[in-house]
Amino acid sequence: MEAFTIHTGRAVPLRRSDVDTDQIIPSEWLKRIERTGFGAGLFAQWRADDGFVLNEPAYAAASILLAGSDFGTGSSREHAVWALQDYGFRAVLSPRFADIFRGNALGNGLLPVQLSAETVEALTSAVEADPTIEITVDLVAREVRGAGLVATFDLDDFTRWRLMEGLDDVGLTLRHEDMITSFEAGRPAWSPTTA
């Protein structure tokens, strides 16, 4: 997992609330077994409309998604996170996230930043007025900066540390590989092993 400390990039204003995981990545994309290649399916039904914001050239290089409230509702679908990442997003800013989506995002290195509705609206309006505006998501300082605004956000220390170290569950476990190997070496030969 790629470490996340400070990210600066352009943003896409997605003026939609209650975006569920089926809208983020339609179910026909869930048959893939790899974790890459989902970017093409991101918001696939909406992207069929030429006027959809992700089709606008001004937002082509954006790496931050500004979303409405209740982003990521619906079924638990890690594919939704993988699609956002594969498309190039490093962070999603919203007034509220579905708990399961938030957990999947944090576990995969996509930073869901919960900000007040007023702050998200101000950033969205600024980006709509000038798509070249850059926003900084600073996990070290727990701040979002852009368009003359500075807003703080909450994230527990352990999750923040994991993201800054680039550690998913497997990476965190492998930090204790010596202890695991030692434990396995001391087990009776008739016991099941992890090898």
From Swiss-Prot:
InterPro entries: 3-IsopropMal_deHydase_ssu, Aconitase/3IPM_dehydase_swvl, AconitaseA/IPMdHydase_ssu_swvl, IPMI_Swivel, LeuD. One of its GO terms (biological process) is L-leucine biosynthetic process. Its EC number is 4.2.1.33. The keyword Lyase applies. GO terms for cellular component: 3-isopropylmalate dehydratase complex. It catalyses: (2R,3S)-3-isopropylmalate = (2S)-2-isopropylmalate. Keywords: Amino-acid biosynthesis, Branched-chain amino acid biosynthesis, Leucine biosynthesis, Lyase. One of its GO terms (molecular function) is 3-isopropylmalate dehydratase activity. Pfam families: Aconitase_C (PF00694). Pathway: Amino-acid biosynthesis; L-leucine biosynthesis; L-leucine from 3-methyl-2-oxobutanoate: step 2/4. Heterodimer of LeuC and LeuD. Catalyzes the isomerization between 2-isopropylmalate and 3-isopropylmalate, via the formation of 2-isopropylmaleate. Belongs to the LeuD family. LeuD type 1 subfamily. This is 3-isopropylmalate dehydratase small subunit. It comes from Frankia casuarinae (strain DSM 45818 / CECT 9043 / HFP020203 / CcI3). The lineage of its organism: Bacteria, Bacillati, Actinomycetota, Actinomycetes, Frankiales.
